[in-house]
C-alpha cells in the first residue's frame, strides 16, 4: 500500500479546509424552485478523542429553474432533529436563499414547521421513498412487491392522465 505521512495529511487537510469554508459560506441564488432535504447517518472519527461515532450529515440539494442540481449545504450534528434543521434553513436564508417553492423531506416530526418558520410560502412534500414506506405499513409482506410496482406506475407516469389511469387501476385492484 501507499505510505502517507501524518504531516502530508495535515497539509492536504489544511489546504482543503479553506476551500470548504469558502464553499460553505458562498452566496446562493435567491430562488430554488425545489429543495430536497435529507440527513444521512455516517461514521466520523472525533478529532480529539479519535473515537469513531455515528453522526448525522444534513444535506440540502437545490434544483435550479433549468433543472440543474446543486448542493446548497452540508452540516454535521450528533443526530437528526427539527431544531438543527431550522439552523440549517437559517444558514441558507443568510446566504441569500429567499424563496423555495417546494421542499421534499422525510417524515421527521417538526420538520415541516421548521421549514414554514424560515420559508412560510414553501410547499412541503414527503419524499416518495418515505411515502411508499408509509403505505407499506398497511400491506402484508406477500403483497408488498406488487403494491410497490403499482405505486411506481403512478409516481413515474409521464403525464397526469397516465398517473390518473394508474391510480384508477390501483384503486380497482
For the regions a language model picked out, list residue spans one by one.
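Extended amphipathic alpha-helical interaction segments
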Residues: 113-173
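RNase H-like nuclease fold core
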Residues: 2-6, 11, 15-105, 109, ...
